[in-house]
Amino acid sequence: MTELARDLKARIAAATGGVTGSVGVGSSKLMAKIASDLDKPDGLVVVPPGGELEVLHPLPVTRLGGVGPATAERLHQVGVKTVADLAAKSLPDLVALAGRAHGTGLYALARAEDDRPVVAEREAKSISQEETFARDLTDLRVLGRYVDSTVSYTHLTLPTKRIV
């Protein structure tokens, strides 16, 4: 598995002219995402089957998908700061705290239970366009031209992508 991940990193670099990427390998989408986030910007982390909780439990609860500022605050109020703290909570406690769907999801994620399928290709829900400048732009007229260009690109691209 590690060799495959190394090959993927090499292919990314070759296809992009040397751009690096972090690769995470795990037994689920959750663990692959966590693994890739552990060693940025140019890392490779493999979480072997059976090692999920060892990696997951020390992390802050905010590393889990679905734990934004509001949920994190509610969890902190009941002493939950790490994923291990979350895993120590009962399902009824989490349902009472976060609601049936969200509480059940948090309960599962804290135990590295994630059966979401990996979908290689999916329908785009958004488009993006960005420009990086060598230095900060302070002239509003120059900035306005770039904004106009970006808006035009978006206006022309949306119908072709069938997003709207």
For the regions a protein language model found, what residue spans apply to each?
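Gly/Gly-Pro- and Ser/Thr-rich, intrinsically disordered tail segments characteristic of DNA damage-repair
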Residues: M1-G105, V118
